[in-house]
């Protein structure tokens, strides 16, 4: 299962959401506070508070605070077969 931790106004999170929608990737959206000091669940899961954060529990992968790395990872593992 893929989970994306983000907040709506974050432009980096938006880039990831748009790419996941474009590639029709199923995921659970987890909204977090804009205030890093209130991102307790995210800190517990990833050890950090940066967004966007992608959690891929099926592959035991967590990528935090780097939209380019997240998109590259999704491209490698989840993009549609027709684009490969």
Regions found by a protein language model. Name each.
Residues 1-8, 14-84:
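GST-like domain detector, emphasizing the conserved glutathione-binding G-site
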